[in-house]
Protein backbone atom coordinates (compact mmCIF):
# COMPACT_ATOMS: atom_id res chain seq x y z
CA UNK A 1 0.00 0.00 0.00
CA UNK A 2 1.52 3.33 -1.06
CA UNK A 3 2.10 6.10 1.43
CA UNK A 4 0.06 8.54 -0.66
CA UNK A 5 -3.02 6.30 -0.66
CA UNK A 6 -2.67 5.78 3.08
CA UNK A 7 -2.54 9.55 3.64
CA UNK A 8 -5.59 10.16 1.45
CA UNK A 9 -7.53 7.35 3.14
CA UNK A 10 -6.75 8.81 6.55
CA UNK A 11 -7.79 12.28 5.34
CA UNK A 12 -11.11 10.83 4.13
CA UNK A 13 -11.70 9.53 7.64
CA UNK A 14 -11.03 12.91 9.26
CA UNK A 15 -13.13 14.64 6.58
CA UNK A 16 -16.20 12.61 7.52
CA UNK A 17 -15.35 12.85 11.21
CA UNK A 18 -15.40 16.65 11.32
CA UNK A 19 -18.39 16.81 8.97
CA UNK A 20 -20.22 14.80 11.61
CA UNK A 21 -18.93 16.99 14.43
CA UNK A 22 -20.33 20.11 12.75
CA UNK A 23 -23.75 18.46 12.61
CA UNK A 24 -23.59 17.79 16.36
CA UNK A 25 -22.00 21.03 17.46
CA UNK A 26 -23.89 23.51 15.30
CA UNK A 27 -26.76 22.24 13.23
CA UNK A 28 -28.53 19.97 15.67
CA UNK A 29 -29.54 22.91 17.86
CA UNK A 30 -30.64 24.84 14.77
CA UNK A 31 -32.92 21.90 13.94
CA UNK A 32 -34.26 21.92 17.52
CA UNK A 33 -35.00 25.65 17.57
CA UNK A 34 -36.18 26.20 13.99
CA UNK A 35 -38.11 22.99 13.41
CA UNK A 36 -38.60 20.58 16.31
CA UNK A 37 -39.92 23.10 18.84
CA UNK A 38 -41.37 25.78 16.61
CA UNK A 39 -45.05 25.73 17.58
CA UNK A 40 -47.43 28.61 18.21
CA UNK A 41 -46.87 28.19 21.97
CA UNK A 42 -43.76 30.31 22.54
CA UNK A 43 -43.46 29.50 26.24
CA UNK A 44 -43.60 25.75 25.52
CA UNK A 45 -40.96 26.13 22.80
CA UNK A 46 -38.61 28.00 25.12
CA UNK A 47 -39.20 25.52 27.94
CA UNK A 48 -38.40 22.46 25.81
CA UNK A 49 -35.42 24.10 24.11
CA UNK A 50 -34.08 25.01 27.54
CA UNK A 51 -34.44 21.42 28.77
CA UNK A 52 -32.81 19.94 25.67
CA UNK A 53 -29.93 22.41 25.98
CA UNK A 54 -29.50 21.53 29.65
CA UNK A 55 -29.41 17.80 28.90
CA UNK A 56 -26.73 18.35 26.24
CA UNK A 57 -24.70 20.58 28.57
CA UNK A 58 -24.76 18.03 31.39
CA UNK A 59 -23.73 15.22 29.02
CA UNK A 60 -20.91 17.31 27.55
CA UNK A 61 -19.55 18.13 31.01
CA UNK A 62 -19.75 14.46 32.02
CA UNK A 63 -17.86 13.62 28.83
CA UNK A 64 -14.80 15.40 30.22
CA UNK A 65 -14.60 12.75 32.92
CA UNK A 66 -15.51 9.83 30.64
CA UNK A 67 -12.97 10.45 27.85
CA UNK A 68 -9.92 9.26 29.87
CA UNK A 69 -11.67 5.94 30.49
CA UNK A 70 -12.52 5.68 26.78
CA UNK A 71 -8.88 6.29 25.93
CA UNK A 72 -7.76 3.66 28.42
CA UNK A 73 -10.21 1.13 26.94
CA UNK A 74 -8.98 1.82 23.41
CA UNK A 75 -5.38 1.50 24.57
CA UNK A 76 -6.11 -2.02 25.85
CA UNK A 77 -7.91 -3.13 22.67
CA UNK A 78 -6.24 -5.92 20.70
CA UNK A 79 -7.80 -7.24 17.49
CA UNK A 80 -6.52 -8.57 14.19
CA UNK A 81 -7.65 -5.28 12.61
CA UNK A 82 -5.56 -3.25 15.04
CA UNK A 83 -6.19 -1.21 18.15
CA UNK A 84 -7.93 1.81 16.64
CA UNK A 85 -9.84 0.76 13.52
CA UNK A 86 -12.59 -1.19 15.32
CA UNK A 87 -13.44 1.91 17.35
CA UNK A 88 -13.33 4.20 14.33
CA UNK A 89 -15.68 1.97 12.34
CA UNK A 90 -18.09 1.00 15.13
CA UNK A 91 -18.13 4.56 16.44
CA UNK A 92 -18.98 5.92 13.00
CA UNK A 93 -21.87 3.51 12.40
CA UNK A 94 -23.49 3.74 15.85
CA UNK A 95 -23.08 7.51 16.11
CA UNK A 96 -24.55 7.97 12.61
CA UNK A 97 -27.63 5.87 13.35
CA UNK A 98 -28.35 7.53 16.70
CA UNK A 99 -27.82 11.05 15.34
CA UNK A 100 -30.25 10.38 12.47
CA UNK A 101 -32.88 9.38 15.06
CA UNK A 102 -32.13 12.50 17.11
CA UNK A 103 -32.88 14.61 14.03
CA UNK A 104 -36.54 13.55 14.34
CA UNK A 105 -39.32 13.98 16.88
CA UNK A 106 -38.54 10.37 17.97
CA UNK A 107 -41.79 8.81 16.83
CA UNK A 108 -43.89 11.83 17.74
CA UNK A 109 -42.83 11.83 21.41
CA UNK A 110 -41.80 15.48 21.21
CA UNK A 111 -45.48 16.35 20.80
CA UNK A 112 -47.37 13.56 22.56
CA UNK A 113 -45.11 12.98 25.58
CA UNK A 114 -42.44 15.64 26.17
CA UNK A 115 -41.08 13.96 29.32
CA UNK A 116 -40.69 10.60 27.57
CA UNK A 117 -39.08 12.43 24.64
CA UNK A 118 -36.48 13.96 26.96
CA UNK A 119 -35.72 10.57 28.55
CA UNK A 120 -35.30 8.81 25.19
CA UNK A 121 -33.41 11.82 23.83
CA UNK A 122 -30.95 11.72 26.75
CA UNK A 123 -30.34 7.97 26.30
CA UNK A 124 -29.78 8.29 22.55
CA UNK A 125 -27.57 11.35 22.94
CA UNK A 126 -25.42 9.58 25.54
CA UNK A 127 -24.99 6.58 23.21
CA UNK A 128 -24.16 8.84 20.28
CA UNK A 129 -21.74 10.95 22.32
CA UNK A 130 -19.88 7.98 23.81
CA UNK A 131 -19.33 6.29 20.45
CA UNK A 132 -18.46 9.55 18.73
CA UNK A 133 -15.94 10.27 21.50
CA UNK A 134 -14.48 6.77 21.13
CA UNK A 135 -14.09 7.37 17.41
CA UNK A 136 -12.59 10.80 18.04
CA UNK A 137 -9.98 9.45 20.46
CA UNK A 138 -9.17 6.51 18.18
CA UNK A 139 -8.91 8.42 14.93
CA UNK A 140 -6.51 11.04 16.28
CA UNK A 141 -4.50 8.55 18.34
CA UNK A 142 -3.71 6.21 15.47
CA UNK A 143 -1.25 8.50 13.66
CA UNK A 144 1.79 7.04 15.49
CA UNK A 145 0.58 3.56 14.53
CA UNK A 146 0.56 4.34 10.81
CA UNK A 147 4.31 4.77 10.38
CA UNK A 148 7.60 4.50 12.26
CA UNK A 149 8.97 7.44 10.26
CA UNK A 150 8.46 10.77 12.07
CA UNK A 151 8.42 12.74 8.82
CA UNK A 152 5.75 10.46 7.37
CA UNK A 153 3.67 10.92 10.51
CA UNK A 154 3.95 14.70 10.14
CA UNK A 155 2.81 14.53 6.50
CA UNK A 156 -0.07 12.21 7.41
CA UNK A 157 -1.13 14.58 10.19
CA UNK A 158 -1.13 17.46 7.68
CA UNK A 159 -3.34 15.50 5.29
CA UNK A 160 -5.62 14.66 8.21
CA UNK A 161 -5.95 18.29 9.27
CA UNK A 162 -6.71 19.37 5.69
CA UNK A 163 -9.42 16.71 5.49
CA UNK A 164 -10.94 17.72 8.82
CA UNK A 165 -11.00 21.43 7.94
CA UNK A 166 -12.72 20.76 4.61
CA UNK A 167 -15.20 18.42 6.27
CA UNK A 168 -16.07 20.87 9.02
CA UNK A 169 -16.45 23.85 6.71
CA UNK A 170 -18.26 22.08 3.85
CA UNK A 171 -21.28 21.53 6.09
CA UNK A 172 -21.90 25.28 6.26
CA UNK A 173 -22.14 25.43 2.47
CA UNK A 174 -24.38 22.44 1.81
CA UNK A 175 -26.63 22.19 4.88
CA UNK A 176 -29.47 24.43 3.66
CA UNK A 177 -29.41 23.18 0.02
CA UNK A 178 -29.70 19.58 1.28
CA UNK A 179 -32.42 20.40 3.82
CA UNK A 180 -34.50 22.33 1.28
CA UNK A 181 -33.97 19.74 -1.47
CA UNK A 182 -35.59 17.03 0.65
CA UNK A 183 -38.18 19.20 2.42
CA UNK A 184 -41.82 19.09 1.40
CA UNK A 185 -42.29 22.56 2.89
CA UNK A 186 -39.51 25.17 2.70
CA UNK A 187 -40.81 26.78 5.91
CA UNK A 188 -39.40 30.18 5.06
CA UNK A 189 -35.99 28.73 4.21
CA UNK A 190 -35.67 26.63 7.38
CA UNK A 191 -36.96 23.40 5.82
CA UNK A 192 -39.09 20.74 7.49
CA UNK A 193 -38.56 17.55 9.48
CA UNK A 194 -38.02 15.42 6.36
CA UNK A 195 -35.30 17.71 5.09
CA UNK A 196 -33.42 17.78 8.38
CA UNK A 197 -33.62 14.01 8.74
CA UNK A 198 -32.23 13.63 5.22
CA UNK A 199 -29.38 15.98 6.10
CA UNK A 200 -28.54 13.92 9.20
CA UNK A 201 -28.75 10.65 7.27
CA UNK A 202 -26.50 11.95 4.48
CA UNK A 203 -24.02 13.38 6.98
CA UNK A 204 -23.92 10.12 8.91
CA UNK A 205 -23.37 8.23 5.65
CA UNK A 206 -20.48 10.53 4.72
CA UNK A 207 -18.87 9.97 8.12
CA UNK A 208 -19.35 6.19 7.87
CA UNK A 209 -17.98 5.97 4.32
CA UNK A 210 -14.99 8.05 5.40
CA UNK A 211 -14.37 5.66 8.30
CA UNK A 212 -14.62 2.65 5.97
CA UNK A 213 -12.12 4.20 3.53
CA UNK A 214 -9.79 4.88 6.46
CA UNK A 215 -10.17 1.29 7.65
CA UNK A 216 -9.43 -0.19 4.23
CA UNK A 217 -6.76 2.27 3.13
CA UNK A 218 -4.53 2.39 6.21
CA UNK A 219 -2.48 -0.19 8.07
CA UNK A 220 -1.60 -0.10 11.75
CA UNK A 221 1.93 -1.12 12.73
CA UNK A 222 2.66 -2.66 16.11
CA UNK A 223 5.55 -1.24 18.08
CA UNK A 224 6.88 -2.05 21.54
CA UNK A 225 7.46 1.68 22.02
CA UNK A 226 3.72 2.35 21.89
CA UNK A 227 2.75 -0.40 24.30
CA UNK A 228 1.39 0.85 27.60
CA UNK A 229 3.20 -1.13 30.29
CA UNK A 230 1.34 0.34 33.27
CA UNK A 231 -2.26 1.14 34.06
CA UNK A 232 -2.94 4.84 34.59
CA UNK A 233 -5.79 5.92 36.83
CA UNK A 234 -8.10 8.83 36.10
CA UNK A 235 -6.72 10.66 39.14
CA UNK A 236 -3.19 10.41 37.76
CA UNK A 237 -4.28 11.66 34.35
CA UNK A 238 -6.18 14.58 35.87
CA UNK A 239 -3.22 15.47 38.11
CA UNK A 240 -0.81 15.56 35.18
CA UNK A 241 -3.18 17.71 33.12
CA UNK A 242 -3.64 20.24 35.92
CA UNK A 243 0.13 20.58 36.38
CA UNK A 244 0.82 21.06 32.66
CA UNK A 245 0.32 24.82 32.27
CA UNK A 246 1.41 24.79 28.61
CA UNK A 247 -1.25 22.23 27.74
CA UNK A 248 -3.87 24.19 29.68
CA UNK A 249 -3.08 27.37 27.72
CA UNK A 250 -3.36 25.46 24.44
CA UNK A 251 -6.69 24.01 25.58
CA UNK A 252 -7.90 27.47 26.56
CA UNK A 253 -6.89 28.92 23.19
CA UNK A 254 -8.70 26.10 21.39
CA UNK A 255 -11.76 26.72 23.56
CA UNK A 256 -11.85 30.38 22.48
CA UNK A 257 -11.35 29.38 18.84
CA UNK A 258 -14.14 26.80 19.03
CA UNK A 259 -16.55 29.27 20.63
CA UNK A 260 -15.84 31.89 17.99
CA UNK A 261 -16.16 29.47 15.10
CA UNK A 262 -19.44 28.02 16.32
CA UNK A 263 -20.90 31.46 17.09
CA UNK A 264 -20.12 32.65 13.56
CA UNK A 265 -21.55 29.52 11.94
CA UNK A 266 -24.72 29.67 14.05
CA UNK A 267 -25.38 33.37 13.60
CA UNK A 268 -24.73 33.20 9.86
CA UNK A 269 -27.35 30.50 9.38
CA UNK A 270 -29.89 32.12 11.71
CA UNK A 271 -29.43 35.45 9.91
CA UNK A 272 -30.12 34.01 6.47
CA UNK A 273 -33.10 31.82 7.45
Language-model region placement:
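Membrane-embedded alpha-helical bundles of multi-pass transporters/translocases
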Residues: 1-273
